[in-house]
Structure formats: C-alpha cells, structure tokens
Swiss-Prot record:
Subcellular compartments: Cytoplasm
One Pfam match: CLP_protease
Molecular function GO labels: peptidase activity
Signal peptide: none
Family stated for the protein in its record: Belongs to the peptidase S14 family. TepA subfamily.
Organism whose genome encodes this protein: Bacillus subtilis (strain 168)
Biological process according to GO: protein transport; proteolysis
Name listed for the protein in its UniProt record: Translocation-enhancing protein TepA
GO cellular component: cytoplasm
Keywords for this protein: Cytoplasm, Hydrolase, Protease, Protein transport, Translocation, Transport
Described purpose of this protein according to its UniProt entry: Required for efficient translocation of pre-proteins across the membrane.
SUPFAM superfamilies documented for this protein: ClpP/crotonase (SSF52096)
InterPro entries linked to this entry: ClpP/crotonase-like_dom_sf, ClpP/TepA
Amino acid sequence: MDHRMENTEEERPEKNDAKDSIMNKIQQLGETTLPQLPQDTNIHCLTIIGQIEGHVQLPPQNKTTKYEHVIPQIVAIEQNPKIEGLLIILNTVGGDVEAGLAIAEMLASLSKPTVSIVLGGGHSIGVPIAVSCDYSYIAETATMTIHPVRLTGLVIGVPQTFEYLDKMQERVVKFVTSHSNITEEKFKELMFSKGNLTRDIGTNVVGKDAVKYGLIDHAGGVGQAINKLNELIDEARKEEGRMIQ
C-alpha cells in the first residue's frame, strides 16, 4: 500500500509538468506539438524579423533582431563542421544601418553556401542583407522598400552630419550593387524616385519586379530556397573533393 502511494505521489509532479508544458505551448504558439529539425541536419536557418536593433535599445513592444545576438550565431555557423549551408529568412522593416551592414558583411564573407528568402518584407537595410547571400529568393507578394538613409524625425542642420549620412548611403549602394545584378544607376533611380511612396522618397518593389531589376535572383518560396541551398552544398562538396585529390 505504502509503495503504491509513493509511486502515485512521484507520478503527479511529472503529469503536472507535462500539462504545464502543453499549456505553455498552446498559449505561446497555438500548438500542442511542434515539428523539430532532425538532429543530423546540415542546414541552419537564421531568421531576421521585425526591426534590426543597433546601439540603441528599442521599446519592448517592438519585435526586433538584435545584431549582438546574430553575429555570434554567424561565427558559430562558420566554425561548426556539421553545418554545411545557411538559410536566411527575412521579414524586416529595416532598422539600424550600421548594424544591418555589419550582418550583411558577415553573411557575405561566409565560406559556406548561403541562400536568402524575403517573405513579407525586406525593407530599407534589409535589402543589403537579402542580397548578401550566394543566391536570393523573394515571395511573389513580398515587398522591398528602397529609400535614402535618414535620421528619423530630425532636421539635418550640420553639414558634417549630412556628409556622414551621404557616405553611409554610398556604402549601402556599393554593397548592394556589388552583391546583386542591379546597376548603380538603376538602384539610385529607385532610391530617389518621387511619387512612388506617399510623403517619402524611394520605391516599393514587389516580388517579381525585384527580380526584373536584378536586385533578387529568383521569385519563389521556402521549398525552392532549400532545394537551391542543397544544390550549392553539393557543388561545394564536389569542389572540396577536387581540392583534396
């Protein structure tokens, strides 16, 4: 009798923990079970969502991607021999220019195959991140906003500040044009276009138009992006095999 009571008491906490875990999943994710990546997967998925946070902390209600979280992940991906390819999923409104460029530069310098896909939006400084990979995709309904670098809500009254922003803008233009098929002339034309955006300068590029301009390589979805990444991984393996021989 005593043994049965002891077993029952031991089982109760485990059942309560299981119930709490299920309730947490329902509250946070709306699901009781979640699909998991296999342990032996050779592809890592990195999501860049919301606003890219730089040196200034954004309000807690904002969904953000913190560059100090992303950069160590990119370093770990480069060093991990089990990871052979990286899939970048973008749905960002933009954010800190220098933080976004830092992420884009790191992605462009990876020795492993990389593929990006823009879902929803890849606006502002999200554009350099989208083009930083070896191959880029955009969903047909996704958009990319191209506009000049600016300080939100401030009037630029000091010439040095204007010059600094102008140089930063040139860095963005140079990076995008050197990592995609769009020309500098066309990119600047889209950037300084008037009448496309309400009360702003710039252009909102949708889906296949981004491909037409040479900004993105292909219009497609997650399945196509993963297939392309696997192709690039196979090519990298063959190249490595040739070097060893």
